[in-house]
Amino acid sequence: MTKNKPKVFLWSLVFSIGLMLAAGSCLADAIDNWIEQFSPSVLSKEDMRKELEWFAKAAEPYKGMAIKTCAENIQTHTYESEVLAKAFTELTGINVNHDIIGEGDVVERLQTQMATNKIIYHAYVNDGDMKGTHLRKKSAVVLSDYMKNEGKNITSPYLDYPGDFLNPEFGYDYEGNTLQIPDQQFPILYWFRYDLFTDPKYMKMFKEKYGYELGVPVTWAAYEDIAEFWTKHVKQIDGKPIWGHLDYGKKGPWLGWRFSDAWFSLAGMGSKGLPNGLPVDEWGIRVENGIPVGATMARGGQLDSPAAIYGLTFFLDMLKKYAPPYAMGLQWSEVGPIPGKGEIAQTIYYCGTFSSFPDYSTPNSPVTDEKGLPKWRMAPQPYGKYWEPGMKVGYQDAGSWTIPTNVTGKERDAAWLFAQFAISKTVSLKKFLVGRTPNRKSVVFHPMWNAETMKPYGGLIEFFRSNERKLFTDTGLNVPDYPLLQEQWWQYISMAATGEKTPAEAMKALAEKEDQLMSRLRLPYLSPKIGEPKGEKYWMGQPGGLKPEIKDRGKAITINYDEMLKRWSQNELR
C-alpha cells in the first residue's frame, strides 16, 4: 500500500491543480461576460476587469454566504435585483437576494428591524430622508468610520467616494460623517411641452395677454399665469383639451410625501443653508445645536408660518383651477404617465423617473417625434414669493445604502461588498441608461454625452451637470423620527384638500401635532427638547426666523429654456 501513496498524492495534486485552473478559468469567463454586459461603462475594459477581479478576491472569505437586501420599486432597483445580484453572485460566490418592495414597506421593515433587533435584511436602499432618524437612534453603521477601520480591507480602492459622487452630502450627519451612501438619485422637476412653448402662435398670444415672454417659469406667479393661459385661454389643441397644470390630490400617504419632499422650501419656508436650512429646515423644524426644539411658530419653527400656509394654498388653487377634474382623485403612482398622453402643457411636479414610461420615448407618441425624441423638456421647479437666494429650492430623492447596526461581523462585510458593487464605476453608467437615476459625476460627464446623445433625456443630464442640482436636496437632519412624523402630514393636509379645514387651520394642527410627538421622543442622541412657546414676535427677530406675511403674489419671471442651458454650461444658475 505504501508504494501507491506517492501516486495517490500525485493524482490528488494534479486533480487539485485542475480544479483551481478550472475555477480560475470560470471566473475569467464570468468577468469577460459581465464586462460586455456592463458596457458602456465609465471605466475602460481593462479597468473594469481590475475592479471585478478585486471584488472576486475581496469576497473569498465570504464565499458561500447568503445575504438579503431590499429596495423600493423603481426600474433602477429592479435592474439591481435581476442583473447586478446575479453578477455579484457569479463573481464572488456570495448569494444575494435583493428584494424589490414598496417604498413604505422598506421603511416599515427597517423600523421593525430597529425595534426588534431581529435581522430582516442585511442592508437597505433607504432614502437619505432617514438620516436624522439614524443619527439620533444610532440605527445605521457609520460608514465613514467603518471604511477606515474594520471594513478597511474590504473597501474598494476603486470606490472613489466621496469625490465621484454627485451629492454625497445627502448621507452626512451634522459633522460630515457618512451614515448612508447614495445608490441612485432623482429630482422632482418642472416638465413642459417645449414644442408648444416655442410655437410662435402661442408665444404671441401669451405676450399680448400677460406682457412678458412665455418660457420656463422661475417663480410661482409666472407658473400660475402659464397655467391659466393653457387651461382658460388656449383650452384645446387639434380638438383635444390642453391643461396648464397637473398634480395629484387623493387622500393617502402619497399626499404627505408630496409636501414633506421639500414643497415648502419652494414656497420659501425655512432658513438659508445648504444642503438644508439651519436652524430651520424645509419641514419647519428648528434645531439648536442639533436638538429639535419645535415646529410651531411659537417655538421658533415654521410649519404653521405664512410661507407654509401659502405653499398649501397655492397647491390647492392650482389643482382646483387649472388641472383636469380627475387630478384630485389621483395618487402618486398614477400621475407619472399622464403628461405623456399629450394633454398636459406643464406640471410643477414631475419625478425624473417618470421619463422612463414608454410614451416619453416611443416614436410618434403624443409627446415625441418620429424618432422618439422628446417634444418635452425638464427644468428646475419654480419657487414662491418667500424664497430667497441662499435657500434650497426643491427635492432630490436619494435611495442610499444603509447597513443597520445589528448586522455585524461577516454579514456586515458581505452586505458592504454588495452595496459597493451596486454603486461601482463598472456598473453605474449602464444602471443609469436603464433607470435614469445617476449617482456619480463620471456618469453624467461621460464623453458619450453630447448635444445629440443627451436629447432623449429632455434636460435631465444637463440638470445633473449643473450647479442647480446642489439646490435640490433631500430631507435634512433636523427630522428626529422620519416615519413617525411623516405619517402625520397626509392626514392633516388631506383635511385642507377636502375643505374640512382651511390651509391655515391644517398647518397649525400639523405643527402642533409634530411638537406633541417630538416632545415624547426619548432618543439616544440629540433627542428633541421642545421648548416653551415664546410667541411669534420673539422669533421674528431671531436668526433664520420667521418671515412676515407677504400680501402680493410676487413677481412673474420666466426664462428661455435654451438660455438657461447656456447659463448652466457656464456654471451659472438660471
Label every model-predicted segment.
Residues 29, 86-165, 200-201, 205-207, ...:
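Extracytoplasmic "Venus flytrap"/periplasmic binding protein-like
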Residues 176, 320-326, 344-346, 362-444, ...:
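Extracytoplasmic/periplasmic substrate-recognition and gating elements
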Residues 222-228, 266-329, 372, 377-382:
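Glycine-centered hinge/linker elements that transmit conformational signals in sensory
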Residues 51-58, 75-95, 191, 195, ...:
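Short, polar/charged alpha-helical segment
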Residues 44, 49-52, 64-83, 186:
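Extracytoplasmic "Venus flytrap"
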Residues 49-54, 66, 373-383, 395, ...:
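Long, aromatic- and glycine/proline-rich binding clefts that accommodate carbohydrate-like moieties
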Residues 30-61, 128-189, 373-381, 553-574:
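Hinge/lid segment of periplasmic solute-binding proteins
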